[in-house]
Amino acid sequence: MHELSLCQSAVEIIQQQAEQHGVARVTGVWLEIGALSCVEERAVRFSFDIACQGTLAQGCELHIDYRPAQAWCWDCSQVVEILRHDAQCPHCHGDRLRVDTGDSLKVKSIEVE
């Protein structure tokens, strides 16, 4: 379950930012999950709760935003959105795609008191 290590890294970033800015408590966190990141929402929510224990983010509300991946098609030279690794180009139906974005988990925003 790699979701736990991803969430631990995200919480470290959140904790560092909160401490740097003298925040008393983190009340909300917005994560962006790419379509090709291979993480499951239930596992992320469970892991995030565990990773937040004993931090300024403990008990905060978690918001998750899913983003499609972007890829470059070598056959028609178009940037396209894809949702799966085995996707074909929607323009030319080629399968020679280079994934550029959408395979990560990012902390997009935090809400604080």
Swiss-Prot record:
It comes from the Bacteria. Keywords: Metal-binding, Nickel, Zinc. Zn(2+) binds at C73, C76, C89, C92. InterPro entries: HybF, Hydgase_Ni_incorp_HypA/HybF_CS, HypA/HybF. It holds the Pfam family HypA. GO terms for biological process: protein maturation; protein modification process. Ni(2+) binds at H2, E3. HAMAP family: HybF_subfam, HypA_HybF. NCBIfam families: hypA (TIGR00100), PRK03681.1 (NF002979), PRK12380.1 (NF009046). PANTHER family: HYDROGENASE MATURATION FACTOR HYBF, HYDROGENASE MATURATION FACTOR HYPA. Belongs to the HypA/HybF family. HybF subfamily. Involved in the maturation of [NiFe] hydrogenases. Required for nickel insertion into the metal center of the hydrogenase. This is Hydrogenase maturation factor HybF. The lineage of its organism: Bacteria, Pseudomonadati, Pseudomonadota, Gammaproteobacteria, Enterobacterales.
